[in-house]
């Protein structure tokens, strides 16, 4: 069995092409467990998770990437956020009936993919591509060609392992400032495209790479763990409350006796009573009771 929830980087010695392979199981399950999503929505989030992991691994700096789908369809938002430590979280918003076998365009409708790159230091960058491809992978390949001018291919697979959702993917990309031959890149892409879902999700990464590229010279680097991690906190909720008009906060307190702030990503609840609100307004740090 493979070591799930790991990302592997690799490099072709005879071509100016690099690759990545990722599989996720536990991380995906944690993203899905607090929600009752229809299966097509689960599949999209699985693909987004794989894609975000692969894209985050292309960063040459500390920071994070958010990949989101937006549109006017029954799933009007799906988003995964990840950082250079491969810490991921995600959520989707459903506002209508989801057909059982809905494809990406049926789910999102008229929409687009937004990729937001936020370095720990430096300026934020945002790229937008229309949802013109039939798959998420095709849309992201289009993004790379438009924004990075780097030939890039993504191969994403979703399925189940031992009855639990899992997903995996591979990325091939021409090295920046290198003169890779198109024929060489196409050859490697053709090999990669033959990967079967079962192989990618159930075989160790090194065996997958050997099956695909055993006639090539490939250097495989140490893997990086992928994990679910939410960045919500009581302090962030308190900061958000500071931005609301006092009369709105007081109205909620008068009606409900407390304010319940819920994180859509992880399901945590943060409760604030009148005393907490008074402390927030006095710039004090409220106590940290938290309901899971």
From Swiss-Prot:
InterPro entries linked to this entry: Heat_shock_Hsp33 (IPR000397), Heat_shock_Hsp33_C (IPR016154), Heat_shock_Hsp33_N (IPR016153), Hsp33_helix_hairpin_bin_dom_sf (IPR023212)
Name the UniProt record assigns to this protein: 33 kDa chaperonin
Pfam families in the cross-refs: HSP33
Compartment annotation: Cytoplasm
Induction: By heat shock.
Organism: Escherichia coli (strain K12)
Alphabetic keyword roster: Chaperone, Cytoplasm, Disulfide bond, Redox-active center, Stress response, Zinc
BP term (GO), one: response to heat
PTM field: Under oxidizing conditions two disulfide bonds are formed involving the reactive cysteines. Under reducing conditions zinc is bound to the reactive cysteines and the protein is inactive.
UniProt record similarity statement: Belongs to the HSP33 family.
């Amino acid at each position: 069995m493979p070591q799930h929830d790991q990302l592997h980087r690799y490099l072709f010695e005879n071509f100016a092409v690099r690759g990545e392979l990722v599989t996720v199981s536990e991380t995906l399950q944690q993203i899905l467990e607090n929600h009752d999503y229809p299966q097509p929505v689960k599949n999209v989030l699985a693909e987004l998770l794989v894609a975000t992991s692969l894209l985050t691994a292309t960063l040459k700096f500390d920071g994070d990437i958010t990949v989101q789908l937006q549109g006017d369809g029954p799933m009007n938002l799906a988003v995964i956020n990840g950082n250079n430590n491969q810490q991921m979280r995600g959520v989707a918003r459903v506002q209508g009936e989801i057909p059982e076998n809905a494809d990406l365009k049926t789910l999102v409708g008229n929409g687009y993919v937004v990729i937001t790159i936020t370095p720990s230091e430096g300026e934020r960058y945002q790229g937008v591509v229309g949802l013109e491809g039939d798959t998420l992978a095709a849309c992201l390949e289009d993004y790379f060609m438009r924004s990075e001018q780097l030939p890039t291919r993504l191969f994403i697979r979703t399925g189940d392992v031992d009855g639990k959702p899992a997903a995996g993917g591979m990325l091939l990309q021409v090295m920046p400032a290198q003169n890779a031959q198109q024929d060489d890149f196409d050859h490697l892409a053709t090999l990669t495209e033959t990967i079967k879902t079962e192989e990618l999700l159930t075989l160790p990464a090194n065996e997958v790479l050997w099956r695909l590229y055993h006639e090539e010279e490939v250097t495989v680097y140490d893997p990086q763990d992928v994990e679910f991690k939410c960045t919500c906190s009581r302090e962030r909720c308190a900061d958000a409350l500071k931005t609301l008009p006092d009369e709105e906060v007081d109205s909620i307190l008068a009606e409900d006796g407390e304010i319940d702030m819920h994180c859509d990503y992880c399901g945590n609840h943060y409760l604030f009573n009148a005393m907490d609100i008074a402390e927030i307004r006095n710039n004090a740090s409220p106590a940290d009771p938290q309901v899971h």
